[in-house]
Amino acid sequence: MEKRGNFPLFSSSLSFLLLILFKENDIIVVMEKKKLRINMLSSSEKVAGQGVSGAYRELVRLLHRDAKDQLIVTENLPIEADVTHFHTIDFPYYLSTFQKKRSGRKIGYVHFLPDTLEGSLKIPFFLKGIVKRYVFSFYNRMEHLVVVNPMFIEDLVAAGIPREKVTYIPNFVNKEKWHPLPQEEVARLRTELGLSDNQFIVVGAGQVQKRKGIDDFIRLAEELPQITFIWAGGFSFGGMTDGYERYKKVMENPPKNLIFPGIVSPERMRELYALADLFLLPSYNELFPMTILEAASCEAPIMLRDLDLYKVILEGNYRATADREEMKEAILEYQANPAALKELKEKAKNISREYSEEHLLQIWLDFYEKQAALGRK
């Protein structure tokens, strides 16, 4: 190796680049790390209107934008990488884990467990056991798992996955996309929908399925005809959706005060959040709903069913309700008490700050660095 003085010159093929900067008669040596290559594997965007695709795109967008000096992020490429991040559990991805080619550290993203599919998809009884075994077999093929729901950790441990192989990293949203709209824009939207300035509006969002509490949302609209209800979302999985035929009939002939706009664009969804006097998600079972983070980022007051998950991830920054009757009472309370509604709106801002891009970016960078280092051992 050629030398000049006491400073060796490294070739560019090595893991570190030696940058020599001359300042007067001094030589400053800066060591620059080689970028990590992260290969994302996901088919989530093939299915519109479901949260996994939104969470995936937000992460990839953030890393491309703000981590380009540390990471090279690729998507669905058959290449060598420091970390291969599996976002969905497609069978071809499962088979790829047995290949000898260097995929680096294999990371699995746990967006659901077999039990959470109940009330979402219509799975024939004879297939349920097969699906459960496949899901856990896929997760076991991973060298580390990331959960978006901290409640999943105990379930994974109970299924035989070592606790030290599981890390909780929450979802987040892009504040450039999800933000409040000016009052004049909100007024225009109300006019567009034929709603007066003082009409109280409750907005919900998500796939139309039993697990989301859509039955309670419909009943609330029937019991509160003076309130306008809007549910954005549809049947992302078509006829496989649990209760598809029944909900399809309701969507085709809803109560007069209930609007089903279907699966909408992010731009339209932002407008609906802006219209909301109250955002209501009456789900019985949730993973880590992107809709809550989106609504909070748009400063919509949040009301939810009282689930253990929310107590952990939202820390009281929402109105908890035990059942449909409590939801009904709370809606009437907020309609009559603007001060209480304003207080709930301030709590939504706390949620938005907690799950900021800046905070989560550093968490992901640290995580990928650690996992890549383990993969090199």
Language model features with spans:
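Short alpha-helical donor nucleotide-sugar binding micro-motif in glycosyltransferases
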Residues: 263, 271-276
